[in-house]
Amino acid sequence: MVLKGTVRGVFLASEAKKRMISVGEARAIAGIGLAGDRYAKGVGSYSNATGANLKVRQISFIQREMIQLANRETEVPFEAVDTRRNVETEGIELEQLIGQYFSVGETLMYGTKMCDPCKIPSNVSGKKGFLEAFRGYRGGIRAQILTGGDIWVGAEIRIYVLGSKRRLAPGWSAFMSR
């Protein structure tokens, strides 16, 4: 069984603490991040990360269903762009991607860790309550970009369990066997 979801939004911010913008698609650069995004440029709020922590900040995801759930607890609703995550998803539980290989559009990624909420989304959006409403599993996840390619609104997200190489797109089997 292959678990699937869909990309519902793609967002970039050129600098730390600047508003994110919604884009129809973005180019994922292996080992770096999304072209034009603050973390790919090394100017994100947490770009000082080193070693293993650097890999976990290449791209971030948030689940549309968790935004809707969190908004039940806020006075002013948060939109996906307000969360400061790069990709809004629908139809897949993001915590299932931790420790898994998965594809998004043309890319292969590896889910690294949960994306703990901080105060920056509230500070940038001017909307109170992000830290509290998006606590725990609602904050989304971070991932490492293993192969570059395009990510777009409407792209499919698929989980690949190690050992199920026959489901991988051409060329990915060799990558997975490294």
Indicate residue ranges for each PLM-predicted region.
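Short, structured beta-strand/loop micro-motifs enriched in basic residues and often containing a Trp
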Residues: 82-91, 133-144
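Glycine- and charge-enriched low-complexity intrinsically disordered segments
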Residues: 137-163
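Flexible glycine-rich active-site/ligand-binding loops centered on an Asp-His dyad
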Residues: 111-142, 164-178
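Electropositive, beta-rich accessory/interaction domains or terminal extensions
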Residues: 1-104, 108-113, 150, 160-178
